[in-house]
């Protein structure tokens, strides 16, 4: 929950190319490799192409995201060797697929559980180097030697968490824009959501659950039958240590293209 997958999404969006995401927990068995490059002759599914080779053939310029790579079968790593070395992969029909214009990103939580444990020794507040040790244990040297870089993600600071809260509120406001509903988030409310929903061990994922519980659910009834049925402004504030929604109903709200996506509250 520190933004590994989100980085790949934003990279593809910035470059304006397709994002191909594969959840590698679906490829834990040895026979699952045939789903990536296709089944050999005589086996069921031979007439169907491999998921990986077909998608890259359709989108030669793309960001290829292999999520949770440590959960895949070790034989999958062997397939990726020629992709990282020569930029090509041969499917079950002998067709060579070009990977030279593909940005390959692999995410992993290897070493995260060891990193979360308390540090041992004087003057140490957290463990260091556990992630590199876990990567060396899971992946063989020939695989690691073909990687351009190994980037370790640290815990998110509070400044970043506040930006993540704004992002979730922006997404909610975009969903409600066709209903003429605008959301104003005060600074105190953003800090309340950040403190309530962020955990060092769990990352930023609990934030969405806090927003679901304290903002989306209370708004649902007002959107259907209440004050927001014909649009309005929702001001999210805090009162007595709790989140409070101040709803102002309007018959018509003109939304201009120049309006900032997140209105600052007074």
For every predicted segment, state its role.
Residues 1-266:
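AAA+ P-loop NTPase nucleotide-binding core of proteostasis motors
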């Amino acid at each position: 929950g520190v933004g590994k997958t989100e980085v790949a999404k934003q990279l593809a969006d910035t470059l304006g190319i397709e994002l191909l995401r594969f959840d590698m927990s679906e490829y834990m068995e040895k026979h699952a490799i045939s789903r990536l490059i296709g089944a050999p002759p005589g086996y069921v599914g031979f007439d169907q192409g491999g998921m990986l080779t077909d998608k890259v053939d359709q989108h030669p310029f793309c960001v290829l995201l292999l999520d949770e790579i440590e959960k895949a079968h070790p034989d999958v790593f062997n397939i990726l060797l020629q992709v990282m070395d020569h930029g090509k992969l041969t499917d079950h029909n002998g067709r060579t697929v070009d990977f030279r214009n593909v940005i390959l990103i692999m995410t992993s939580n290897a070493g995260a559980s060891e990193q979360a444990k308390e540090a041992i020794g004087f003057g140490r507040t957290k463990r260091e180097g556990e992630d590199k040790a876990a990567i060396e244990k899971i992946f063989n040297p020939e695989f690691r030697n073909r990687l351009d870089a190994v980037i370790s993600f640290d815990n998110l600071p509070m400044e970043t968490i506040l930006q993540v809260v704004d992002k979730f509120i922006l997404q909610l406001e975009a969903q409600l824009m066709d209903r003429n509903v605008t959301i104003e988030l005060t600074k105190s409310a953003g800090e309340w959501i950040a403190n309530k929903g962020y955990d060092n061990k769990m990352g930023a994922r609990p934030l969405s659950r806090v927003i679901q519980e304290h903002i989306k659910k209370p708004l649902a009834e007002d959107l259907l039958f209440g004050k927001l049925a014909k649009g309005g402004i929702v001001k999210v504030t805090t009162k007595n240590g709790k989140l409070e929604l101040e709803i102002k109903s309007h018959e018509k709200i003109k939304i201009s293209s120049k309006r900032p996506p997140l209105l600052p509250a007074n």
